[in-house]
Amino acid sequence: LGSEQVLVKAAGNAGYAYSAGMNQMATATDTNGNLILDGQMLVVGNWDANNDQINGSSNKAGTVCATMQNGVCIDAAKIKDFFIMANGTAVTSTATNGGYTTMSGTSMAAPVVTGAIAVLHQMWPHMKGKHLVQLVLVTGDKNITGYNENVHGQGLLDMDAATRPVGA
C-alpha cells in the first residue's frame, strides 16, 4: 500500500456485534508488532440518519481480539480503533437497468468515507494516508445516544470537524 493510499472497507451487513474477516486487516501486525497496513485502513459501519442510530443490519465495531493473554486482549490495535460510521441507509444510487434505486448497507456508507478521504487529501495533499485516517477517526462525532465504542467505533464521520484547521 503506497503511503498516500487509504483502504476503505465496508463492515458488512449481517448485523453481527463485531466486524471480522478482511476487516481484521486494519489491525494485523507483523512479527515486530507494527501494523501491516500502517494505519491506512478504515472499516465503515452504516449509520441510519433517518432514525439517528447505527443500522440494525450493519456489523458493529465489536471486540474481536487476535491475541489473548490470561483472558485479556493484548492487541495493540482493535477494529473499533479504525471503525467509523457514515450514512448508508436509503441512499439513491444507479440501478442495473440504467435508472435509479434506493439502497441501504455498509456498501453505501463506504463510498461516503472514500469521498471524505478524497476531499481531505485535496485540502491537505502533504498528508500521508495514515494521517488522513487518523484525522477522520479523531474528529468522529461521538455525540450519539448510547455511544459505545464496541458498537459505534470512533463515531460518525464529521466532515465539519475534519476540515477545520487544527486548533480552530
PLM features: residue spans?
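Metal-dependent catalytic neighborhoods of phosphoester/phosphodiester hydrolases
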Residues: 19-25
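Active-site environment of divalent metal-dependent phosphoester hydrolases
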Residues: 13-19
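P-loop NTPase catalytic cores that bind/hydrolyze ATP
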Residues: 1, 111, 118, 138-139
